């Protein structure tokens, strides 16, 4: 089953 797209992950500092 295809998973729903996840929100973009912000770059770590």
UniProtKB/Swiss-Prot annotation:
Q: Name one GO molecular function term.
A: toxin activity
Q: Which residues form the signal peptide?
A: none
Q: What does this protein do?
A: This peptide both inhibits the activity of the angiotensin-converting enzyme (ACE) and enhances the action of bradykinin by inhibiting the peptidases that inactivate it. It acts as an indirect hypotensive agent.
Q: Localized where?
A: Secreted
Expression by tissue, per the entry, reads: Expressed by the venom gland.
The entry's cellular-component GO terms read: extracellular region
Provide the family line.
Answer: Belongs to the bradykinin-potentiating peptide family.
Q: What is this protein called?
A: Bradykinin-potentiating peptide AP
**Has keyword Amino-acid biosynthesis?**
no
Residues with Pyrrolidone carboxylic acid modification: 1
Task: Kindly state a single biological-process term from the GO annotations of this entry.
Answer: regulation of blood pressure
Keyword annotations for this protein, in alphabetical order, are:
Hypotensive agent, Metalloenzyme inhibitor, Metalloprotease inhibitor, Protease inhibitor, Pyrrolidone carboxylic acid, Secreted, Toxin
């Amino acid at each position: 089953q295809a998973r729903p797209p996840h929100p973009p992950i912000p770059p770590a500092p």
